[in-house]
Regions:
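Short amphipathic alpha-helical segments
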Residues: 24, 50, 189, 218, ...
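Conserved small-domain helix->loop->beta segment predominantly found in fold-type I
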Residues: 241-309, 326-332
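Short, well-ordered beta-strand elements within core beta-sheets of diverse protein domains
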Residues: 222-231, 279-286, 341-346
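Positively charged, small/polar-rich N-terminal and surface patches that mediate targeting and assembly
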Residues: 8, 34, 194, 255, ...
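Conserved PLP-enzyme active-site core in the AAT-like
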Residues: 51-252, 257, 268
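Short conserved active-site loop signatures built around small residues
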Residues: 1-2
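PLP-dependent enzyme catalytic core of the Aspartate aminotransferase-like
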Residues: 91-92, 100, 114, 118, ...
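Conserved N-terminal alpha-helix of the aminotransferase class I/II PLP-enzyme fold
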Residues: 9-60, 85-92
Length: 364
C-alpha cells in the first residue's frame, strides 16, 4: 500500500521528466498512486473498458465527468429517475454554468429522440435506477447516442460489472459509486469512471487539477473487496429475488419491484442486459408516508441507513430521507412515492431478513 502524499526522485532529471510526462514516475497522489491504479486497473478489466480514473466518491466521478465534457450553453439528456444528489446537480448547480437538462421517461426510451437538441452533448442514465429500480434499455439508448454522435454515460452502480456491462451496449463511459457493492461492507468511500482512453484522459486532466482523488487506503480496501465481488453478488441476488417473491401479493403492499420479477414493467429488458436482478428490491406501502415511518421504526434486525450494497440488510424510506428536499411533485416525477421502501438485501439468512420485514409490516 502506497500511503503517501508524494513520491521522491533520485535526481533532478527524473523529476523534470516526470513533470514533462516523458517517464511514468508518480509525482503526487492527487495525480496518481500505484495502489489507486491497481484498483482502477481491476475495474477497467471487469467493465471491458480501455482506461479509468478513480475518485473520492461516486458523486465526485459523476461531477468530474460532467465538468469535463459540458460547458456553458450545453444540454444534457438524462433518465428522469436519478439519485437525489445527481438530481441536485442538474437542478441547482448546472444552471450556474448555463448547462440545461431534460428528463426522459425511463419506460419510454422511444420518446427520448424528441428531447435531443442541437446543443445536446451527453446522454446520462442509471439502470437500474435509484431508488425506483426502473430499468432503462441500454441498447436503444446506445443506438440513439451513436445516431446523433452524443456522448453516452451510464451509472452502473446498482448492477456492478458482475451483472451488467454497459459498454457492450454502446456506452462511452461507465461510472460507479464504489462505496456500494464494490466495497460491500460499508467501510470506505470511492468512485470511478471507466471507458474510452481518450475520454478518460480528459477526465484525468480535469480531476488532477480539481482534486477529487481517491485515498490510497480506500483504494486498497476496494481492491481487496473485488476479490469477493462475484460470490457476494450471487448471495445478494439469491436473497433479493427470494425476498421479492415472498413479499409479492402481501396485503399491506401496493406492489413489489425487482428487475427479475416477471411483474416488473421492464422484465424482458432486464433479462436482456443483466445477468441477474441485483441485490435491491423496493415495495410500496399502502398506508403512504405515515406507514413508511411506522415500518422503519418497527424493524428489529435490519439497519436504517442511507447506504446500500452492504453485507447487512439495509432499509431506507426515500420520501423522508434521500429525496426529502424535493417537492411532492418532483418526488413523483422521479418515481418516489410516499410509501416507497428501498431494501438493500444483505448476506444474512433469508428467513431472518424476511421475518423482520413481515413482522414490521404487521405493525403498519
Amino acid at each position: 500500500m502506497f500511503l503517501t502524499s508524494s513520491f521522491c526522485f533520485d535526481n533532478a532529471e527524473d523529476m523534470r521528466d516526470a513533470f514533462n510526462e516523458t517517464n511514468d514516475h508518480n509525482i503526487y497522489t492527487r495525480f496518481s498512486n500505484p495502489t489507486v491504479q491497481e484498483f482502477t486497473d481491476k475495474m477497467v478489466a471487469l467493465e471491458g473498458a480501455e482506461a479509468g480514473f478513480s475518485c473520492a466518491s461516486g458523486m465526485a466521478a459523476i461531477f468530474g465527468t460532467f465538468m469535463t465534457f459540458l460547458q456553458s450553453g450545453d444540454h444534457i439528456l438524462s433518465c428522469a429517475s436519478v439519485f437525489g444528489s445527481t438530481h441536485t446537480l442538474f437542478t441547482k448547480y448546472m444552471p450556474k454554468w448555463n448547462i440545461d437538462y431534460s428528463y426522459g421517461e425511463v419506460n419510454d426510451v422511444d420518446s427520448w429522440e424528441a428531447l435531443i437538441k442541437p446543443n445536446t452533448k451527453m446522454i446520462y442514465l442509471e439502470t437500474p435506477t435509484n431508488p425506483g429500480l426502473d430499468v432503462v434499455d441500454l441498447e436503444k439508448v446506445g443506438k440513439l447516442a451513436k445516431k446523433h454522435n452524443i456522448l453516452f454515460c451510464v451509472d452502473n452502480c446498482f448492477a456492478t460489472p458482475n451483472l451488467q456491462l454497459p459498454i457492450k451496449f454502446g456506452a462511452d463511459l461507465v461510472i460507479h459509486s464504489a462505496t456500494k457493492w464494490i466495497d460491500g461492507q460499508g467501510r470506505v468511500l470511492g468512485g470511478i469512471v471507466v471507458g474510452k482512453k481518450d475520454l478518460i484522459r480528459e477526465i484525468y486532466l480535469f480531476c488532477r487539477n480539481t482534486g477529487p482523488s481517491l485515498s490510497p487506503f480506500n483504494a486498497w480496501v476496494l481492491s481487496k473487496s473485488l476479490e469477493t465481488l462475484d460470490v457476494r453478488l450471487e448471495r445478494h441476488c439469491d436473497n433479493a429475488e427470494a425476498l421479492a417473491k415472498k413479499l409479492e401479493g402481501h396485503p399491506k403492499l401496493g406492489g413489489v419491484k425487482y428487475p427479475f420479477l416477471p411483474s416488473h414493467p421492464a422484465y424482458e429488458i432486464a433479462k436482456k442486459q443483466m445477468r441477474r436482478g441485483g441485490g435491491l428490491i423496493t415495495f410500496e406501502l399502502k398506508g403512504g408516508l405515515e406507514s413508511g415511518v411506522t415500518f422503519m421504526n418497527a424493524l428489529q434486525m435490519i439497519t436504517l441507513t442511507s447506504n446500500l450494497g452492504d453485507s447487512r440488510t439495509i432499509a431506507s424510506h426515500p420520501a423522508s430521507t434521500t429525496h426529502s428536499k424535493l417537492s411532492a411533485a418532483d418526488q413523483l416525477s422521479v418515481g418516489i412515492t410516499p410509501g416507497l421502501i428501498r431494501v438493500s438485501v444483505g448476506l444474512e439468512y433469508i428467513d431472518d431478513i424476511a421475518g423482520d420485514i413481515l413482522q414490521a409490516l404487521e405493525k403498519c
